[in-house]
Every structure is written in C-alpha cells, then in structure tokens.
Amino acid sequence: MTSGAVEFVDESNIRAAVRAVFEDLRLQLAALLPDAAIEHIGATAVPGAVTKGDLDVCVLVDQGGFAEADRLLAERFARNVGSDHTESLSSFSDGSKAVPVGIQLVARGGPEDFFVRWRDLLRDSPRVLEAYNALKRQWHGRSHESYRIEKSKLIERALRAHPNTPEDSS
C-alpha cells in the first residue's frame, strides 16, 4: 500500500498465517533462485513489533546475478511501483496470499543491503524496538506516505547509531 491511512494489527494474531505464507514462498523462491538467501524481514519477523499484518521478504543475490533474478521475479510477481527501483534493489508484491506480501530483491553489499541488519537490530535491541513501535503507533490512521518518510529516517538513525550490528552473513 502506498497511499491511504496506516493501519496496524497485533502481530501475535497473525503470526501463524505469516509463518505459513513465508515457508511456502521461501520454497518457491529457493527453487527459482537457488543461490539466493531468503530472509523473513519486517515487523512480522520481530516478536512484539507493531505491524500492518503483511509479510516482508528479502531475497539477497550477488550483484552479478541481480538482473537475472529481477527478470525471474518480474515474471511471477507484480512490481511494487511505489518503491524504489535501482540497480541493486527491486520491489515486488503479491496480494494473492493469506497475508499481503512484499518482496525486496537486494544485491549483497549494495546500498540497500540493510534489511536483515535492521531486522536483527530490532530483535536484539528492546530500546530500538520500542522507538519503532512508538513511531508506528503515532502514525496509526494517518498518512502512509508521511509514515514511510518518518520510518526511513528512524531506520537510518538507528543503523548509524548501532554500526556494530552484524551485517548479513549470507
């Protein structure tokens, strides 16, 4: 969703549905892109996080395989036209599952290769998770575009403040 109001749900109520969709999708993506690392990211990957109730997946590939992975994913999923599209990031969506799905195709080591690190920081830092949840609660029912801008600022600040958070090792 790129417009309208932000609506959040209790992640514990949708955890089983998200897990089932992720496992099914992980198998499909692994068959399609056997050299990719496939990670459950986003709020539903973080116990206690406030979420919109969707599933976010990060597909990490080497830069040399990015264009081919992008082509293969574009044959099977809709492009998320509201998201950035660069030489190292492509976004896709799938509304046909039990929960909405967003897929971020990311080149390892590229400028957008921070999704797994952000997930791990949220899992490891109660303080960062609480700040993230507070931001989300503040934006509940308000502009989605403005929320995305503020969320990006918070993520950038938190990652800069925690430079020793382990990078993705896949």
Residue positions per predicted region:
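Conserved short hydrophobic interaction patches
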Residues: 32, 72-76, 121
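Metal-dependent nucleotidyltransferase catalytic core
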Residues: 8-26, 61-97
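Conserved, surface-exposed functional patches that form binding/active-site neighborhoods
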Residues: 80-134
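Helical scaffold of the NTase/Pol beta-like nucleotidyltransferase catalytic core
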Residues: 1-39, 170
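Active-site nucleotide-donor binding segment shared across nucleotidyl transfer reactions
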Residues: 26-68
